[in-house]
């Protein structure tokens, strides 16, 4: 695998380098200085782990240092705005979730506009879920709804104006219940449940790997069963119309040279085929792949429309 990856990476980088040289001698040596990848969340989750693998591959392929900077805050708005306002030269790259280019703009939370970013590509689909402790008195959305109508259920989420949070609130509305309390967290993991900070949490499987034997999945926010909990029902099966898929990709400021984006894409595509990236996919059930800029743009457009529908559903 290692030898194949080295050959594939060399081929992809060579192709991108030829493209750079054809466009501009000044860009042919990109990167000529360190590249910063901004992750607008704390360290540890899937986007952080995979971005670090990509940064390492860039360093190996180009000889230039590449680093990951975590800038959490505002449901990813703070770090994302740092990308949007950076120079369009390829030296600041955002590793951004679906909400950054959809829900935050729809809700008016973002200081940047819809055309602030250009997609390099998408490389991750999250194994996202609504999770509870194993001894919780409910195992699916119907049982949760029945319990919450008379009992207390505290929800932990990553932010009010994020797609999974909005989907959870829409699901509760359609099922006729309200959470007794809810709060946003920068990080949601085993300790959140163990400490009683929340009774159910919206999170990814990567953050609860250390307590898989102590939790249950109430609903999977995916289009396919979770590999770690294959019997868990999809949210869309339990609440028709809520077809939720959450992804992450690389974005650069508008106006970044195409040749630079091509080189970033080549490095990322090769990195997703490495053993390290595939090990993460196997361990967590994450979708690890490469979707090019054109296909990513179509996916983003659909996600924007779907996010608008979530907002409308909550206002009814």
What name fits each language-model region?
Residues 27-115, 151-152, 163-164, 172-202, ...:
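N-terminal (or domain-start) structured segment
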Residues 82-91, 105-188, 235, 245-280:
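Hinge/capping helix and adjacent helix->loop/strand transition within the periplasmic-binding protein
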Residues 1-4:
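Positively charged n-region of N-terminal signal peptides that target proteins for export
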Residues 8-21:
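Bacterial N-terminal signal peptides
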Residues 32-34, 174-177, 259-316:
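An extracytoplasmic/periplasmic, membrane-proximal ligand-sensing/linker region
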Residues 113-123, 179-182, 199, 206, ...:
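Short beta-strand->loop
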Residues 42-44, 98, 133-138, 157-162, ...:
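Short coil/turn segments
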Residues 20-28:
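Sec/Tat signal peptide C-region and signal peptidase I cleavage site
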């Amino acid at each position: 695998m290692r030898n194949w990856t080295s050959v594939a990476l060399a081929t992809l980088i060579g192709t991108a380098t030829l493209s750079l040289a054809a466009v501009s001698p000044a860009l042919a040596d990109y990167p000529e200085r360190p590249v910063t990848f901004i992750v607008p969340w704390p360290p540890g989750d899937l986007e952080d782990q995979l971005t670090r693998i990509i940064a390492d591959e860039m360093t190996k392929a180009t000889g230039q240092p590449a680093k990951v900077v975590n800038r959490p805050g505002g449901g990813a708005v703070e770090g994302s705005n740092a990308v949007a306002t950076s120079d369009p030269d390829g030296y600041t790259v955002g590793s951004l979730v679906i909400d950054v280019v959809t829900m935050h703009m729809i809700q008016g939370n973002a200081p940047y506009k819809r055309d602030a970013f250009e997609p390099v590509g998408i490389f991750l689909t999250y194994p996202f879920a609504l999770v509870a402790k194993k001894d919780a008195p409910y195992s699916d959305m119907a049982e949760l709804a029945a319990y919450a109508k008379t009992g207390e259920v505290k929800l932990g989420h990553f932010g009010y104006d994020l797609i999974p949070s909005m989907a959870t609130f829409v699901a509760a509305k359609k099922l006729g219940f309200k959470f007794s309390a809810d709060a946003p967290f920068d990080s949601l993991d085993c300790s959140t449940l163990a400490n009683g900070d929340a009774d159910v949490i919206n999170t990814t499987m990567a953050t609860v790997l250390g307590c898989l034997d102590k939790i249950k999945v109430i609903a999977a926010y995916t289009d396919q069963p979770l590999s770690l909990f294959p019997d868990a029902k999809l949210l869309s099966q339990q609440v028709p119309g809520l077809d939720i898929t959450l992804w992450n990709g690389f974005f650069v400021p508008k106006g970044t040279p195409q040749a630079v984006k091509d080189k970033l894409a080549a490095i990322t595509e090769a990195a997703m085929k490495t053993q390290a990236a595939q090990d993460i996919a196997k361990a967590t059930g994450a979708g690890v792949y490469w979707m090019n800029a054109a296909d990513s743009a179509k996916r983003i457009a659909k996600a924007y429309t779907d996010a608008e529908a979530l907002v409308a559903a909550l206002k009814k």
